[in-house]
Amino acid sequence: MNPIQHILDTYPLIVLDGAMATELERKGCNLNDSLWSAKILMEEPELIKQVHTDYFAAGADCAITASYQSTFEGFAARGLSEAEARRLIELSVSIAAEARDEFWSLEENRLNRPKPIIAASIGPYGAYLADGSEYRGNYAISEDELIEFHRPRMKALIEAGADVLACETIPCLTEAKAIVRLLKEFPETYAWISFSAKDGLHISDGTPAADCASWLDEHRQIAALGINCTPLQHIPSLIEELKKNTSKPIIVYPNSGEQYDPETKTWNGAACAESYGASARTWHEKGARLIGGCCRTKPENIQEIAAWARSLKTT
C-alpha cells in the first residue's frame, strides 16, 4: 500500500514535521560533528523522541527519522561494528514509531487528522562526505557505486518498519536514478524523492527541475516528489515546474529563509518576514500536497501550517 496516497485519498494535505537538528540544538545538543543528529542517536536518543513528540503535538502527520546522516560508513569511522551501526539506524525508526504510538494512544490527539506515518530519512551521498557536496551534486562516483552506498541503510530502515522512505536533499538526477533502481529490490516499499535546488528552476547540480519530475513520474514506487533544504523564495516557481511535468503528489519542505554556508557550516541572514504558515498556504494553492519544514524550522512553524490545514475540506 502507498501510505502517502492512502492519506491523500481522504485529506487534502499531509503536514510534515520540521527540523530535527534545530530542535536538538535548542535542547542543548552540540551537533558540530560529521554525524550531525545521528550523533544524538548514539548519546541521547530520548531527546530525539521528545522532538518527534513535539512535532506530533504541533500537528505533523509525518515524522522524518534522525537517520539523514546515519550510514554504515559514518558509524564505522567512529569505531562501531556493522551490527552496532544497524542497531542505531533501526533505532531511528523505532524511536519515531514509539513517539507516534504514544501520541496516538490519546483520543484527544486523533481529532480531524490522519494517523501519522514514519518516513525514514535517507540523506544523499554528499551528506556522508560532510563536505557540502550535498548542495552541489558533483560526486566523483558512478550510479552503480551510489546504489552500493545506499543499499545497506535502505535495507535496514525498511526492515525496521518505516512506512515510507524520505530520500531527501538529493542534489543530482543521477543519485535519484540510483535510488529508483535500488528501490526495485524492495518492490513493496514506497519512497519520496526531494531535491535540493539552486534557484527557482534547477536542482543543485543545474539539472532542470522539470526534467527530474518527468523522469520520476514514470516510476510506481515514487509516492511523491519535490524540493527540500532550499531557500523558501524559490519554492513557488519550483512547484510550478514540477506540477507541469508530473501527476504525482508534490512535496515541499524548505528552509526557514536563512542561508547556509557549507564552508563555515553556519547560517546567515534572517528568516522570511512573512509567516511560514502563510507561505505554506501559497505553496498548497500552487499544488503542493505535502508541506513541512527543513533547516531552522520549528514546531511553531508546523503549528502555523496545521492551523489552516485542518480547516481544509476532507473527501
UniProtKB/Swiss-Prot annotation:
Keyword field contains Transferase: yes
Keyword S-adenosyl-L-methionine attributed: yes
Superkingdom, natural source: Bacteria
Effect of a null allele: Cells lacking this gene show reduced bacilysin biosynthetic activity.
SUPFAM superfamilies, A to Z: Homocysteine S-methyltransferase
Cofactor or coenzyme needed: Zn(2+)
Enzyme Commission number: 2.1.1.10
Record's catalysed reaction(s): S-methyl-L-methionine + L-homocysteine = 2 L-methionine + H(+)
UniProt xrefs under InterPro entries: Betaine-hCys_S-MeTrfase_BHMT (IPR017226), HCY_dom (IPR003726), HCY_dom_sf (IPR036589), Hcy_S-methyltransferase (IPR051486)
Binding site for Zn(2+): 229, 294-295
Coiled coil: none
Hcy-binding domain: residues covered: 2-309
Keywords annotated in UniProt: Amino-acid biosynthesis, Metal-binding, Methionine biosynthesis, Methyltransferase, S-adenosyl-L-methionine, Transferase, Zinc
Any one GO biological process: methylation
GO molecular function, one term: S-adenosylmethionine-homocysteine S-methyltransferase activity
Protein name: Homocysteine S-methyltransferase YbgG
The species this protein was found in: Bacillus subtilis (strain 168)
Gene: ybgG
